[in-house]
């Protein structure tokens, strides 16, 4: 049994958090993805900020009947606090476009492009931005040897929060024939790049700053490291030469514009040790809003506190015609 599982939930759970306010916000979180718990932690801080800002807030733990529940609630805006499938992959934005309800974060196509690692890679390469070499491997290929020279990274095609990500080093006792494809029939195998982990926060198309991740325990920036204290040190701003810092901001804004994102985004890069070459790893159109999350931390460095960050995200709410 794998630690992180999707699960079907028939009925949404609705809870009124604040019954009066200037606008009615439906805070949609939880859901049916493997990132359910992260979403719920993010929603706790977001709900508090929305109430402080004077909004009427209804919390919705998303189930399969989400469309019916939203019709009953009739919100002015949906705050999309879902992570992973059904929210971050474009499903909820697509539904809200049909229902003509304004929502936060990126739209259907932008979310889908960023969430699918193959399509994201294609977008990045067309814009001459460096990305690690990779191949797609299917379960039906029945590969019984390493599909790429070690070290390499195994990634599910469509997961976030580093769920399902494994790094295979030269010394590891790992046989690819034993890999059981827990998150779908296809995976992406990516060249592992040793270097400096760098994160960029963006808000409404503008890069706010760069943060460095220094690993303290685990070998890579995995789920455990992202969501537990004491596994990584955050250095903000990242200690980089001015020209390199500026390049990161420019590259991030270019990707944001290419994919046509909206609201908050987090971009992940690696600065390769040997060549000093920058590689983009991914962008996240639904970055975490937990106490350990990177976008709120960089925003604070840029002079935007958490409550104001949530207000800015709300201001950009819209649906696609």
Swiss-Prot record:
Its cofactor is Mg(2+); Mn(2+). Residues 121-315 form the ATP-grasp domain. Keywords: ATP-binding, Cell shape, Cell wall biogenesis/degradation, Cytoplasm, Ligase, Magnesium, Manganese, Metal-binding, Nucleotide-binding, Peptidoglycan synthesis. One of its GO terms (molecular function) is metal ion binding. Binds 2 magnesium or manganese ions per subunit. It catalyses: 2 D-alanine + ATP = D-alanyl-D-alanine + ADP + phosphate + H(+). Cell wall formation. Belongs to the D-alanine--D-alanine ligase family. It comes from the Bacteria. PANTHER family: D-ALANINE--D-ALANINE LIGASE, D-ALANINE--D-ALANINE LIGASE B. It is found in: Cytoplasm. Its EC number is 6.3.2.4. Transmembrane segments: none annotated. Mg(2+) 1 binds at residues 268, 282. One of its GO terms (biological process) is regulation of cell shape. InterPro entries: ATP-grasp, ATP_grasp_subdomain_1, D-Ala_lig_Van_CS, D_ala_D_ala, Dala_Dala_lig_C, Dala_Dala_lig_N, PreATP-grasp_dom_sf. Its main location: cytoplasm. One of its GO terms (cellular component) is cytoplasm. Mg(2+) 2 binds at residues 282, 284. ATP binds at residues 148-199. Pathway: Cell wall biogenesis; peptidoglycan biosynthesis. The keyword Zinc does not apply. This is D-alanine--D-alanine ligase.
């Amino acid at each position: 049994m794998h630690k992180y599982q999707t699960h079907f939930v028939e009925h949404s759970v609705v809870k009124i958090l604040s019954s009066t306010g200037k606008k009615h916000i439906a805070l949609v979180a939880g859901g049916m993805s493997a990132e359910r718990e992260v979403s719920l932690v993010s929603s706790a801080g977001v709900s508090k900020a929305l109430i402080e800002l004077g909004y009427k807030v209804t919390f919705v733990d998303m189930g399969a009947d989400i469309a019916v529940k939203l019709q009953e609630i009739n919100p002015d805006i949906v705050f999309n606090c879902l992570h992973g499938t059904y929210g971050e992959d474009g499903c909820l934005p697509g539904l809200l476009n049909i229902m003509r309800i304004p929502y936060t974060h990126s739209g259907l196509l932008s979310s889908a492009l960023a969430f699918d690692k193959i399509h994201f890679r294609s977008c990045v390469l067309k814009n001459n931005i460096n990305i690690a070499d990779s191949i797609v491997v299917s379960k039906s290929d029945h590969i019984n040897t390493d599909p790429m020279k070690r070290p390499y990274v195994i990634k599910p095609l469509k997961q976030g929060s580093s769920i399902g990500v494994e790094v295979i080093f030269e010394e590891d006792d790992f046989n690819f024939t034993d890999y059981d494809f827990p998150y779908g029939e296809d995976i992406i195998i990516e060249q592992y790049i040793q270097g400096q982990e760098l994160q960029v926060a963006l808000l409404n198309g503008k890069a706010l700053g760069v943060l460095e991740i220094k690993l303290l325990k685990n070998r890579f920036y995995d789920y455990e490291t992202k969501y537990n204290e004491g596994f990584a040190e955050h250095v903000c701003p990242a200690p980089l030469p001015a020209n390199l810092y500026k390049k990161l901001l420019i590259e991030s804004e270019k990707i944001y514009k290419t994919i046509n994102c909206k609201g908050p985004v987090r971009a992940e890069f690696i600065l390769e040790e040997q060549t000093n070459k920058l590689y983009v790893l991914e962008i996240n159109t639904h970055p975490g809003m937990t106490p350990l999350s990177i976008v709120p931390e960089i925003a604070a460095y840029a002079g935007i506190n958490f409550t104001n960050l949530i207000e800015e995200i709300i201001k950009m709410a819209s649906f696609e015609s």
